[in-house]
Amino acid sequence: MAFSFPDHFRFADSHEYAFADDSLVRIGISEFAVDQLGDIVFVDLPEEGTAIAKGESFGSVESVKAVEDMYAPVSGEIVHRNNSVLASPEELQNDPHGEGWLLIIRPDNPAQLKELMDSETYSKKISA
């Protein structure tokens, strides 16, 4: 399967994406990660107001194959979580880069985005 990643996305080694959305950062998991997981049946996300730290687990996604932790690509405070994905995990399955986003955070250090892979580098990584 060929994957397409938006140019403005930045990616962590653990397959989470992040991108600046005004002064906030939107976080999700890549289409590649969703494909590897298979049918997603459950998503667990922290409450709004929770602080997350870059590289630390912030929730999990459960599929028919496995339960995988998700890791924060940047540090910050959760200002919004996608409750639609919690109620209907298939939204993550069907549109991970759009309606299937997971969190919006107020970043502690927006420069952390620059430490993540750009779309081209991430595409090469998953193709290797």
UniProtKB/Swiss-Prot annotation:
Q: Which cofactor does it need?
A: (R)-lipoate
Q: Which Pfam families match?
A: GCV_H (PF01597)
The keyword Cell inner membrane is assigned to this record: no
Q: Where is the Lipoyl-binding domain?
A: 24-106
**Which GO cellular component terms, listed alphabetically, does the Swiss-Prot or TrEMBL entry include?**
cytosol; glycine cleavage complex
Q: Where are the transmembrane segments?
A: none
User: For this protein, what does the record note about how its cofactor is bound?
Assistant: Binds 1 lipoyl cofactor covalently.
Q: Spell out the Gene3D superfamilies in the cross-references.
A: 2.40.50.100
Subunit annotation: The glycine cleavage system is composed of four proteins: P, T, L and H.
According to its UniProt record, which protein family does this protein belong to? Belongs to the GcvH family.
Q: What task does this protein carry out?
A: The glycine cleavage system catalyzes the degradation of glycine. The H protein shuttles the methylamine group of glycine from the P protein to the T protein.
The protein's name in its UniProt record: Glycine cleavage system H protein
Q: Which organism is it from?
A: Prochlorococcus marinus (strain NATL2A)
